[in-house]
Regions:
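Conserved protein kinase catalytic core
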Residues: 180, 256-257, 343
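Rossmann-like AdoMet
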Residues: 2-143, 147-236, 240-244, 402-404, ...
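A short SAM/SAH-binding and catalytic strip from SAM-dependent methyltransferases
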Residues: 229-265, 309-313, 317, 325-327, ...
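Generic structural "secondary-structure junction" signal
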Residues: 89, 96-97, 103, 109-110, ...
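Conserved RecA-like P-loop NTPase ATPase core
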Residues: 117, 247, 337
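A mobile, often basic/glycine-rich helix-loop segment
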Residues: 246-300, 348-359
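Long, Lys/Arg- and hydrophobic-enriched amphipathic alpha-helices
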Residues: 291-464
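Short, well-ordered beta-to-alpha junction loops that form the rim of enzyme active sites
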Residues: 145, 250-252, 336-339
Length: 464
């Protein structure tokens, strides 16, 4: 499903231009999406020409003041720079000081819908770990752990088996001080007295100046979970200790910054974000670079046939780092996210209170996201890692016997709990809900080719 990123009307006749950019003019708004990352169609008809006479612009936020000052000083920012500021600005970023997940937040994720989801992820990791002889120690690494629900459900399964319980440790990559506290409460029941994430950035720089890359003391927080498993928090993946690792990135890559490019008769141009002091509904607007930018020259494939493209260099760096670790230390990884195979170009959007929201409206108050280009990730790890998928979430979970797990739980459940279990199952696997919209991609070191040829990864093939 393609989502038009041009989510506001730009009235004809805008006169404000910059030396390196043109205002984008277009005729209408047509945004499709889904509640909690999926919803119903809304907005204006794409073919009609609407004229807006806005009496009042949208509310100004603290982050908007910061963005306006930055743009006034240095010029329009890229969409990638905008996303990074909106989501992770230390003072006013969306993720930094609030609970954004669940019914009280802006999005709902699979682990929050059913504990079975995390249990099956743990089962998958245990299966792949067993295939290669159960190497020790075993690091479970989650990127962007949300509330900690997925990790908590996985550890409950790991702790049931002595082989894994005695060797496993949990490593969480999290930049948000608030979310790291929620994760610690969920996993450990207490919050340790430690430096916050912002102070950890200074610690990160110091450690990389004065310690070896192999140092295992780069965490900014450490505790013991309710299951007796050591858990540590890190601001960067590079701080996580090296070893045989099971990587899980659930709805993580879709929040990483993307550059947006548009094909014109003069070649590729980058979409930028500028101040709008005119009659637009918000204080910011999209503009088009007048010429090629360094990003458009470097990131757009000369053979690209789409008219618009989104590229996330940060995603590329991270997936390559994971591939290198798998190649050097062994392990496996799962990327679970909304995404496509390189066929889409306009997916940048925002969510607030479980509904689509204009990305330029009141920055810092809504979640920003862009679908993951799985073909881009696979291309970047080619030769370093084996990849399987992406396949739909519903297919993966059915192959992992989620229905059998559901039937077992229903036998001992009350009527009310049975209703909840069935509803959660439908939400996770149904094609018109999350079943087709979320995708699973697996990564393995290339030296596992022979093993995986004989015994393909669980979940990616139908069980016998």
């Amino acid at each position: 499903m393609t989502v038009n990123f041009l989510t506001r009307i730009s009235p004809a006749g805008l006169s404000h231009t910059l030396k390196n950019s043109w205002p984008i003019k277009f005729q209408g708004l047509w945004a499709l999406g889904f509640t909690a990352r999926f919803s119903t169609e809304f907005g204006l008809h794409p073919r009609r020409n609407y004229s807006f006479h806005v009496q009042e612009k949208s509310r100004e936020t603290k982050l908007l003041h910061h963005l306006r000052a930055r743009i006034s000083a240095t010029g329009p920012v890229t969409v990638a720079e905008y996303m990074k500021e909106v989501l992770t600005n230390p003072m006013s970023g969306y993720y930094m000081h609030r609970d954004v997940i669940g019914s009280s937040g802006d999005v709902i994720t699979s682990p929050e819908i059913s504990h079975t989801f995390g249990e099956l992820i743990a089962k998958w990791f245990l299966n792949e770990w067993t295939k290669v002889g159960k190497p020790k120690p075993l690091y479970v690494v989650e990127l962007g752990p949300g509330r900690g629900t997925l990790s908590d459900d996985m550890l409950r399964v790991f702790s049931q088996f002595s082989d894994s319980r005695e060797v496993v440790s949990l490593h969480l990559v999290e930049v948000s001080p608030h979310l790291s506290q929620l994760q610690e409460l969920k996993l450990c029941g207490t919050v340790s007295v430690v430096k916050d994430v912002l102070e950890a950035e200074d610690r990160h720089r110091h450690l990389h100046l004065h310690t070896s890359p192999e140092s295992e003391e780069n965490f900014y927080k450490h505790n013991i979970t309710k299951h007796g498993v050591p858990v540590s928090w890190y601001r960067h993946l590079e701080d996580v200790p090296h070893g045989f690792s099971c990587f899980i990135a659930h709805e993580f890559f879709d929040a990483l910054p993307v550059h947006k490019f548009q094909k014109t008769h003069e070649g590729w141009r980058e979409i930028l974000i500028d101040i709008d002091d005119n009659v637009g509904p918000h204080h910011l607007r999209y503009v088009l670079s007048r010429g090629p930018t360094p990003a458009s020259k470097f990131f757009v494939d000369p053979k690209e046939t789409r008219s618009s493209v989104e590229v996330s260099p940060e995603s590329g760096v991270l997936v390559q780092d994971i591939a290198i670790r798998l190649e050097q230390e062994g392990g496996c990884g799962l990327v679970v996210d909304y995404g496509h195979d390189g066929s889409k170009g306009d997916t940048f959007r925002a969510f607030r209170r479980h509904a689509l929201h204009d990305p330029l409206c009141e920055p810092g108050t809504a979640d920003l996201t862009a679908d993951v280009d799985f073909s881009y990730l696979k291309k970047l790890v080619q030769g370093r890692a084996l990849t399987y998928g992406p396949i739909p979430q519903g297919m993966f979970l059915e192959n992992m016997s989620i229905k059998a797990r559901l039937e077992k739980l229903l036998k001992s459940a009350t009527p009310e709990l049975q209703k909840q279990l069935k509803s959660g199952y439908e939400m996770l696997v149904s094609s018109d809900k999350m079943g087709d919209r979320l995708k699973f991609l697996a990564l393995f070191p290339t030296d596992m080719q022979e093993v995986l040829t004989k015994t393909p990864p669980a979940g990616f093939v139908a069980p016998p």
